[in-house]
Every structure is written in structure tokens, then in C-alpha cells.
Amino acid sequence: LIYMLKTALCLSVFYLFYRLWLGKETFHRFNRMVLIGLILVAFVIPSLKVSQNFHLPQIEQVFERLNIPEEETEQEHDLQKMEQVTTTTLHTQLEKERSDFTILTLGNLGFLYLGGALLLLLRYIFSIACIYRLIRNSEKKCWKGKIRLVVHQQNVAPFSWRHYIVLSRQDLEEYGEEIIAHEYAHIMHKHFRDLLLAEICLLFQWFNPAMWLFRKELKTVHEFEADESVLKAGIDAKKYQLLLIQKTVGT
């Protein structure tokens, strides 16, 4: 739990750094690499151990520097020892109660943390199962080597997953070229790997808003990068912008 809290702190600081210094930059590929790098570094830093070697001077040297007589120090030591003996029972009881409370608190937090991670993992598994079912029940076409076009009869939002491009029959007939070019750009840029990394990290940092914001920023950069690739491929800019507007407003 301590490691996860340190990681959460690093992610929060790094996200603020990204938003302040790179949030408005249009170098999408660079921003993408920075986002991935910051996420990885945030998980590595808390695991680093810094060794500190402190050499305590000998007691005799301390006495010599302070010019304290040895007999006087022995008397003070005896008095301190007597005081410690009289308070040992009280301190022991307080430490035991504090230890029991700490163990109980950490145990509850641990169960809560694992419960949240488990729910998120189940959601991922359910989402993947739904994607596989959608692909299995749709028409599939080979396109550019290993790429598979998955055409569904129902009105599903276009998306790409691994080497699959999924879209509805209506989208294929109206804006097939633009949508396929956009989703193909996601596949070629290997955005799936970035999102997989973000989802795995989110399993461990589900309680941290910064990790959710990192994933959101990563998805935004992916969309900008894909749009840029589509326009470079020669797709009509006005028609593509109209498609983006329609998909944004849901018409």
C-alpha cells in the first residue's frame, strides 16, 4: 500500500507537469511518448532504494568535544534508566493498542483496494468478451494483409481492436473510406499497446484520479495522431471534418 501511495503521488505530480508544460503542444507523437514515459517512471521511482550511510562518532569523542565529565554522564544515564523502567508498562500497552489499530486499518484498506482492482478486472474481461462476441456475430473481410474488417448490421460505433476494424453497415456505405483510414491509423501506430499498458496500470491505481486522467490524455493524443495520418493519406478534409462533427453530436 505504501508503494501504491508513493506511485499515486508521482502520477499526480507528473500529470500536473504534463498539463502545464505539454498540454497545449501539437507534437502528438512526442506527447504520446512523454505520457507513456511518465507513467512508467511513476511506477519505477517508488521502488528505488537510496542507501544512506551514517557514521556515528564514538561516545568518548563526544564527551571530549563537549567536555562533559564521565561520572556526570553516568549519573544522568542511571536517572534516565530509572525513568524508562517506570514507564515501560504504559508504553508497551500504548504501543500494542496502536499496533492493533494500525493492523486493522491496513487490513480494511487492503481489502478495499483489492476489491476495487477485482471489479475493474472483471469489467475488462466482460468488455473483451463483448468484443469477441461482436466480432464472431459479424461479417468479416480481409483487408491489407492481416487487417480484418468487421461489418455489423446494427448501428455500432466504429473502433479498432488489435488487427480488427469494427464498423456498422451504414457507416461502411456512407463514410467507409474515412472511417477505415482513421481506424487503420490506430492499428499502424500501435495505439492498442499504449491503451493496454494504461489499463494494466489502472488496475493498480484505480483509486487515483491522475491515472484516469493519464489514460484520457493518451486517448486524446491517439485521436489527434490518427486524424493527422488520415489527412496525410489524402482523405478530403472537409468531408472528414463533417464526419467528425456527425460522430461527435451523435447524428
Predicted regions and their residues:
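Low-complexity, acidic polar-rich segments
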Residues: 68-99
